[in-house]
């Protein structure tokens, strides 16, 4: 298999990254160790190479109105310098992917450009789907990453580190806010233009940065010199799972609706605009989904993994979608689907792990919330 390499691939290897195939890319699963990386992000700061993810630019007349036909979230709620999390839907309300939409316009009344970040595993199919539905309306799609670097800097010290390196004040940038920042000392072109968004996939404060390859390599080395430890896919998974953030392809897929996945807050049925799957979701909103994604805590140290059966009265009633040992909580946690009648907080079920039944309790999500910044 010919795996793709990000511009930081050799730097990840040099930093001790243990590389594994992931969504067609050769990516680091860990560096110093999952526990150390996890704790660094929770307590200080860590960085992730996420350059495998897809980044598309949408340009034309009112691209937001055109994209609106494919997502259930009211995109008019965001303006220039703002972003939102949403999902791409098919005709039956099934989730094709989750994504973040960034408004790159100069004013809310005349937004001509959007940036969207999509999952690596869905990048090709998403692009085909978007072109099929957006290009006939005159919206042009292009690769905004352009073989560049997408870097996540996450943790309570992320703001201080990034302010020190950039010379910019970033503390006031709101969650899901974004801006272009001019960085000095990142290569031949001085200054380098860096897209910075206050977004992430860890449950911590932090930023995601999009920049050209050479500037990204220089920034990686500067962050290493600052003592920021590199983190791999392993700790990214334990961090996102503690925060109960969905992983597409495991916790939701084309056969899952937002209401089933606990993402009903993304569905804005009060807006008049039509969107893909609206009729199906209106019906499900009225009747209620027959199953729901739940958070689970297991007694003991056994780990529930994707696909493990969920049992009630010794009968299979659902499946685990994601599970891990939580370094922050010292408990085994998991996400999974249960019939709505069994999905209430406090309900007891069991997980079948290697032929044995392990008690589990339905709990409130997320499992972990970062301490208040105040």
From Swiss-Prot:
Gene from which the chain derives: gcvT
Cellular component, GO annotation: cytosol; glycine cleavage complex
Protein name: Aminomethyltransferase
Enzyme Commission number(s) of this protein: 2.1.2.10
Family in the record: Belongs to the GcvT family.
Record flagged with keyword Ligase: no
Function: The glycine cleavage system catalyzes the degradation of glycine.
Alphabetical list of Gene3D superfamilies matching this protein: Aminomethyltransferase beta-barrel domains, Aminomethyltransferase fragment, Probable tRNA modification gtpase trme, domain 1
UniProt GO MF annotations: aminomethyltransferase activity; transaminase activity
